[in-house]
Amino acid sequence: MKAPIPHLILLYATFTQSLKVVTKRGSADGCTDWSVDIKKYQVLVGEPVRIKCALFYGYIRTNYSLAQSAGLSLMWYKSSGPGDFEEPIAFDGSRMSKEEDSIWFRPTLLQDSGLYACVIRNSTYCMKVSISLTVGENDTGLCYNSKMKYFEKAELSKSKEISCRDIEDFLLPTREPEILWYKECRTKAWRPSIVFKRDTLLIKEVKEDDIGNYTCELKYGGFVVRRTTELTVTAPLTDKPPKLLYPMESKLTVQETQLGGSANLTCRAFFGYSGDVSPLIYWMKGEKFIEDLDENRVWESDIRILKEHLGEQEVSISLIVDSVEEGDLGNYSCYVENGNGRRHASVLLHKRELMYTVELAGGLGAILLLLICSVTIYKCYKIEIMLFYRNHFGAEELDGDNKDYDAYLSYTKVDPDQWNQETGEEERFALEILPDMLEKHYGYKLFIPDRDLIPTGNIEDVARCVDQSKRLIIVMTPNYVVRRGWSIFELETRLRNMLVTGEIKVILIECSELRGIMNYQEVEALKHTIKLLTVIKWHGPKCNKLNSKFWKRLQYEMPFKRIEPITHEQALDVSEQGPFGELQTVSAISMAAATSTALATAHPDLRSTFHNTYHSQMRQKHYYRSYEYDVPPTGTLPLTSIGNQHTYCNIPMTLINGQRPQTKSNREPNPDEAHTNSAILPLLPRETSISSVIW
């Protein structure tokens, strides 16, 4: 049965006058297009959803039944986006179906995302609107999609109700829904102050740890519907104006600056929670805002949030004055305000007077600090600094140019087979490492008595050798102290005077802890006797390293001279002089005369016997190399055989002077005692002719 004509006219009039006033995108083909509706559908893949035609829910004051009675038909189209081609939807009646003014998806698929346009029209009238549908997947490891959440805020200590949103289409009027709640996708033992009512979760007293994501889960048929709401907890809404932290309201703050320099005035304030209202903080000079000043040199920085907690903020803003002039001086005020009031505080920008006293004190303080630093550096690195200066700018030591040696080395000689575990390192250092480093590495010329002194030389010869040296090095090993190796310097008057008057500089090397050793008190007395004395500690094998403090200190105390270090090839000549360098030679004529005299007095049978016996014994006892010389059968040594050689023998000085020893004619020569008679000893190498172990 058709409706009466007056009734249809009234329906059309009501329909056309009840249109929602919104911005229309335009009209095409006589159809009014309301573009995309503000309501957007967002659903997880696999969940059901109902899309309603928005024309019946806000654009016109009618429903689907009245429109259909008025002869209007409803059609659905789908497009990928605004302006794209729209194609009619073919409903299959199962997964996607048209039911009155809606489309049902049971369930949704990813390809269902897009714009769905509903159009109502007849032959004379047309209107359409598009509805957006987004189908997404859960985030990895979560039960929700972070882009499809609802957002709620709650104030601390107040109550908050969280609803399970947009589930009206899945509720039955005759049945209570069964809804499960999760926090961060996990079941939770809810505290008693949290209550569940139908489709809501009620928190009676909000706490800070209530912040998080709440997910409600509802079963609809064979499907699951989930909605997630993120709850943010804030401080209670403030009813007070902001609080100025700096400058303070109660007093005027003075900030000094120099003309021509830059000035920075910083204002800090605390803002309570005021909802979504941003903090308002700014500077003024007098009654003018900073941006209203004519000077471009004066400007405000951006507002910076220093701290934020539960919506409460501590913020700051700076006023910068570039190249301060007289006109920039004056009073500046910082204002802060919110809906509850306004506060301000002032800063007086003042010209700084030059304070010459302070500047002078600062300059003197800087000089004093520099002086202290320089003295400290010099104290710590004095030796390194002096060595650097000597090596690059120093001149050779002129005092003592007429002396032949850089140093006289005094030590106690102990055979290696007598070294023990406690003193072995000290003896090796004194006999091998010390002379080898000084001569071969640093290039010094040493007088080593064991090497350079005529074996039977007397104490006057030692004094002359010390006098020809620029330094006296005494190596204080435990054996040296026990044997009182310094006695020679006390017995000879000339040597003692040299030490007391400071004619020679003494370097005393202590190789170990000497306290408690016999004769140690005499060592201390000796130190007080020597006028020019330097004591250097040798602390064991770690001091043997070339870059150690020990070698730097010793090089500093030695005379400075520009000498190329002696190489191993330079230290040895054709006569194989030994490990410590050039040897002193004895006059060839005197040695020949002495040898002839000595051998002439010896029994012929003892010559070869003693020669072999003495050499074999001394080779076993001494650690230096030994050298053999063949004695001519005539008992005299040709002059050419000892020329250009360093030949040594254990011959008394009386024989070198041409004297002949007195012997008893009635005494038979004893071969076993032949080695004790120095008058008949043959020519021996210098290693086996040492008559003393202390030099």
From Swiss-Prot:
Coiled coil: none annotated. Residues 657-679 are annotated as: Disordered. The chain crosses the membrane at residues 358-378. SUPFAM superfamilies: Immunoglobulin, Toll/Interleukin receptor TIR domain. Residues 25-134, 143-232, 242-350 form the Ig-like C2-type domain. Changing residue 34 to A: Abolishes Interaction with PTPRD. Abolishes synaptogenesis. Disulfide bonds join 31-126, 53-118, 143-185, 164-216, 267-334. Glycans are attached at residues 63, 122, 138, 213, 264, 331. This is Interleukin-1 receptor accessory protein-like 1. It comes from Mus musculus (Mouse). The gene is Il1rapl1.
